[in-house]
Amino acid sequence: MKQAIIFLKLWMISLLVGGLISCQQETPVTSVIHIDAEGTIQTVNPDLYGITLEEINHAIDGGLYAEMIQNRSFEDGIPPLNCPYDARRRVITTPNGYDMPFMRLDSLPGWRPLSTNTWIYPDTKELLNEKNKRSLVVSIATSAQNGRGGVVAEGYNGLAIQQGETYQLSFYLKGASVLPKNLHIALEDSIGNRVLSDVFTVSTHYEWKKYRHTFTANATSNKAILTFSSDSSQTFWLDVVSLFPETWKGRPNGQRQDIMEAIAKLQPRFVRFPGGAFVEGYTAGTYPVWKETLGNIAERKHFWNVWGYGTTNGTGYHEYLQLCEDLGAEPIYV
């Protein structure tokens, strides 16, 4: 009982003291800060103003890089080195024990059959070269009832084309038969009912062959597709399918005009590339090696990056240096 009374007295005293303290007059303000917005105390080095470019959320592939075709070499779906794949859970396990989401190994993001009479699959045997690990096999079984067949490239949420603009197409093609078969390539609307460009017709060969063509769009669309179609039954392989609009400053394998014009207006004094976590990766083969980003795009090393999607290395070391030169900015490679 005595303890309770003592506790109550102490509690009341603390309340009284707190109340007296809160009633004290505030300390008067004796200091004033003056800001002179017109004056300059110390100039900032202009070389400290620049930009960072990183492959994250498709900022480069599907963003700054002008390539319109997603998964152009069909190598998305190849698990990184030393990362076991769990097909049931659709995850890969990194060497550090982290589980990361991963697509089915036969996935072909950015591609689909043109019709139900067509079967497509990533092929690991009919390869363009030793550095390119997969191609796309397309098998068409046409009839009077089911019409034409083929394969569609949808790009990154559709191909944005402008009437009157030109688009540079290149691809590698191989036929399954020694007898040549005709294949028609065109830009079409999203459901393949309307042709939005001229039609490029080629004959297949029994060996890999590279083809080039310049399309001129006859309509404007934000959801166009690129089609490879045939009215006859046939099997063929595709690889390194590339479609470019006019690039900034006309650079081959270059960057998008609209984004680069916006960057140029910032007048950066330096460009830091190719990223932060992107250059770290999480196992061998999940980070860029500058020597592997040079030369023919058909031989550049594709890899699955730390942000969970495939990287073409299309904007490689040379393209970054060219970008810096065109901007008049210093390159900072990390």
Write out the residue ranges for each language-model feature.
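Bacterial Sec-dependent N-terminal signal peptides
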Residues: 1-29
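Extracellular and organelle-lumenal recognition/adhesion modules and their flexible linkers in secreted
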Residues: 23-315, 325-332
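Aromatic/hydrophobic pocket-lining residues that form π-stacking "cages" and hydrophobic walls in ligand
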Residues: 320
